[in-house]
A protein has these predicted regions:
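Amphipathic terminal alpha-helices
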Residues: 284-298
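N-terminal Rossmann NAD(P)H-binding glycine-rich loop of SDR-like oxidoreductase domains
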Residues: 1-22
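Mid/C-terminal beta-alpha module of Rossmann-like enzyme folds, strongest
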Residues: 196-197, 203-258
């Protein structure tokens, strides 16, 4: 199997390099790769030449404009990366008869209510990021290519910056913390996403009827506030230097912390379709976060 991975240096892309390697010949590309492997998503049409050069049976797109607040001030760039480029890759995949794997987000929903969203639930993005990611989904579906779209949320990895690292740093520096309590979701490891992707690619190649849209997040749910407390208390139990006392971590509402982009309060995603289709049991979010903490604190 010839696999083209674009966006290989991001959190998910880095883990995909590991997870996809056993499946076949893997060509991993990013915006700073040397020619002819350069994946310039700001010039989406150049991606056709990349696909023609590699001639893959599977294209995995892990590239995106994920700076949610920044997207509000640069919507054209966000649209090029999140909507136009996936559409070009989809057309190239259809022309070659290749499978396109793409990642989307809970931000395509408006975050109302408390029930987990299914794949068929009405969308209603609140931000430029969410809108452009939805447009990317729509472009892929409209292309008619074989595709696998995985919506996810609250993605983290041991490599690079993440929420847990930030909380640990602040907890060691400050006497008090305020953390948002009314946004709820499931922290999902990039390693879990990559492993599910590899499993799903094998399955879809054998059973094409499994292609389509799925939700992929870790099991369980938490708020950013409870997530922060879990991280800090775990580190304290391991003897790490934590300055802030448990009672000095205060919950605050999203409304008290305004940002350029609106965030969905309800980021719960229903994963029953994914688990049933591919015979999976997704682990609880605490398992993945604890594993990540052991890695970054070792």
């Amino acid at each position: 199997m010839n696999i083209l991975l674009v966006g290989c240096n991001g959190q998910v892309g880095w883990e995909l390099q590991r997870a996809l390697a056993p499946l076949g010949k893997l060509t991993a590309c990013d915006f700073d790769s040397p020619e002819p492997r350069r994946a310039d998503f700001s010039k989406p049409e150049s991606l056709r030449a990349l696909v023609d050069a590699i001639q893959p049976q599977v294209i995995v797109n892990a590239a995106a404009h994920t700076a949610v607040d920044k997207a509000e001030s640069e919507p054209d760039l966000a649209r090029a990366l999140n909507a136009t480029a996936p559409g070009v890759l989809a057309e190239a995949a259809r022309a070659r008869g290749a499978l396109l794997v793409h990642y989307s987000t809970d931000y395509v929903f408006d975050g109302s209510g408390q029930a987990p969203r299914t794949e068929d639930a009405p969308t209603g993005p609140l931000s430029v990021y969410g809108q452009t990611k939805l447009e990317g989904e729509q472009a892929i579906a409209a292309s008619g290519c074989a595709h696998l779209i995985l919506r996810t949320s609250w993605v983290y990895a041991a490599r690079g910056g993440n929420f847990a690292r930030t909380m640990l740093r602040l907890a060691a520096e400050r006497d008090a913390l305020q953390v948002i309590h009314d946004q709820v979701g499931a922290p999902t490891g990039a390693d879990l996403l990559a492993d599910v992707t590899a499993h799903a690619i094998r399955a879809v190649r054998e059973r094409p009827e499994l292609q389509g849209l799925y939700h992929c997040v870790a099991a369980g749910e938490t708020s950013w506030y409870d997530y922060a407390r879990f991280v800090i208390e775990w580190a304290r139990a391991q003897g790490r230097p934590i300055r802030v006392a448990p009672e000095a971590i205060a919950p605050i509402a999203t409304a008290a912390y305004p940002t350029p982009a609106r965030r969905p309060l309800n980021s719960r995603l229903d994963t029953h379709r994914l688990q049933a289709a591919f015979g999976l049991r997704l682990p609880h979010w605490q398992q993945g976060v604890e594993r990540m903490l052991r890695e970054i604190l070792s």
